[in-house]
Amino acid sequence: MIIDTTEIETINSFSKLESLKEVYGIIWMLFPILTLVLGITIGVLVIVWLEREISAGIQQRIGPEYAGPLGILQALADGTKLLLKENLIPSTGDTRLFSIGPSIAVISIFLSYSVIPFGDHLVLADLSIGVFFWIAISSIAPVGLLMSGYGSNNKYSFLGGLRAAAQSISYEIPLALCVLSISLLSNSLSTVDIVEAQSKYGFWGWNLWRQPIGFIVFLISSLAECERLPFDLPEAEEELVAGYQTEYSGIKFGLFYIASYLNLLVSSLFVTVLYLGGWNLSIPYIFVPELFGINKRGKVFGTLIGIFITLAKTYLFLFIPIATRWTLPRLRMDQLLNLGWKFLLPISLGNLLLTTSSQLLSL
């Protein structure tokens, strides 16, 4: 069978078209991920700037003001400085554990953002077990911290890693029990379903009013998970120099710095999703699109409003951990463990039993 030149050109053009479709498919698949990473990076820079400005206001001093207007580029300048610093590795430590520890901490926190809905079904992965996926993934981060402390071959680093692991285990259980109580109220483990379950009664439908005890326990546990004051024992400067970060410099130290703020942002986002109604606005906004001549059928305006509401609630809530840093003194290690095991765990367990009983009685 003889194939002429025209048929060969047709086959080649068809194969090129299929290759282009594959390339476009890969780009379209990576676009949401890259957009989320870019948004998270900008969000972390905003948190750093807010913390410095709020801290300066609390201490009645002037915050950063030279790096860009109002000092908004100060965090970017600090990151550039860390990138240009020398990356030192301890000669007597475990090089592999020392190098892989920061990466595990950052990647595990980054994966948590994949189940957070920023708008109406605007989520990277709408999993049916979204909240438990977050708990499972976030529990990997302390493993990276422990590896960093052990791989540094430094007593201060090792003690900091052990403290981080003990603290995470102590407060992960009350956190999970509070999340389970919310899931029982919403009859779902999906983050999207939990937000939609709070949209029935507007402001009064938030889980904050139905789970006030769980909200307080969740707030304390999330502060401990983020290692924020008064729970920053793994890196207490007066006791452990810098904890598991003592031997780190350059980009690896910058990864730990980013991981702490990534964890703070993801905790605040989950507070918004689980307790503050997510993307739902508490006041009617049905007539706003018609007022400005915007067609709501395209859902563009509604999506932008949802993203704005979610981020506004998140950054308003961030004022609490930032203000707490300059308000409360650091706990001792025995006080921290007693608070987690003797108080928060029984309270969260009792809250779960009450929630289960109320749900059974309502059947």
Swiss-Prot record:
Q: Does the keyword Chloroplast apply?
A: yes
Q: Which NCBIfam families match?
A: PRK06076.1-2
Q: Which UniProt keywords apply?
A: Chloroplast, Membrane, NAD, NADP, Plastid, Plastoquinone, Quinone, Thylakoid, Translocase, Transmembrane, Transmembrane helix
Question: Which EC number(s) are documented for this chain?
Answer: 7.1.1.-
Q: How does it sit in the membrane?
A: Multi-pass membrane protein
Question: What main location does UniProt list?
Answer: plastid
By sequence similarity, the record places it as follows: Belongs to the complex I subunit 1 family.
Q: What does this protein do?
A: NDH shuttles electrons from NAD(P)H:plastoquinone, via FMN and iron-sulfur (Fe-S) centers, to quinones in the photosynthetic chain and possibly in a chloroplast respiratory chain. The immediate electron acceptor for the enzyme in this species is believed to be plastoquinone. Couples the redox reaction to proton translocation, and thus conserves the redox energy in a proton gradient.
One Gene Ontology cellular component annotation held by this UniProt entry: chloroplast thylakoid membrane
Name of the molecule in the record: NAD(P)H-quinone oxidoreductase subunit 1, chloroplastic
Q: Which PROSITE patterns match?
A: COMPLEX1_ND1_1, COMPLEX1_ND1_2
Q: Which Pfam families match?
A: NADHdh
